[in-house]
Design a protein with these regions (language model features):
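Strongly charged
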Residues: 1-132
Length: 132
């Protein structure tokens, strides 16, 4: 986790909202959303179970993270904007945006942390044997 408590709190807010299936708009960045992927058959005897995955789009979708900060921190929009700006400055690196405990955005591709994938998919990804 980050050494900055404010950054940790915003990261946790993002994780909680995504785990709940919400879409989040990150102003100046784009939107994160959870996609449900269906089961797929590997062969006659095995199926990969359905899963949830975080995806990214440059379009504005869902609730603004600033509005979520207003609700969570019980503050006004101006203060929430300031928190968001400081958070964004702390998580943006060279061509990446890293949300500790959630994942990393490189270009237009979001890669979830393995631990967060298990939050979204507590039963894992191992193929399931089909009984007849």
């Amino acid at each position: 986790m980050s050494a900055n408590p404010m950054t940790e709190q915003v990261n946790r807010l993002i994780a909680n909202r995504l785990a709940a299936g919400c879409e989040l708009f990150l102003p100046g960045v784009g939107s994160l959303y959870v996609e449900q992927r269906g089961a797929r058959r590997l062969d006659d005897e095995r199926v990969v179970p359905p899963c949830r995955a975080v995806n990214f789009t440059t379009q504005e979708q869902g609730v603004s993270l600033i509005d979520e900060i207003v609700r969570a921190a019980h503050c006004d929009h101006e203060k929430a904007q300031s928190i968001y700006d400081r958070w964004l400055d702390s998580v943006v690196g060279e061509r990446t945006l890293t949300i500790s405990g959630v994942g990393e955005l490189k270009g237009n591709r979001f890669n979830s942390d393995p631990e967060f994938e298990m939050v979204l998919n507590p039963y894992g990804f191992d193929p399931v044997r089909i009984r007849e």
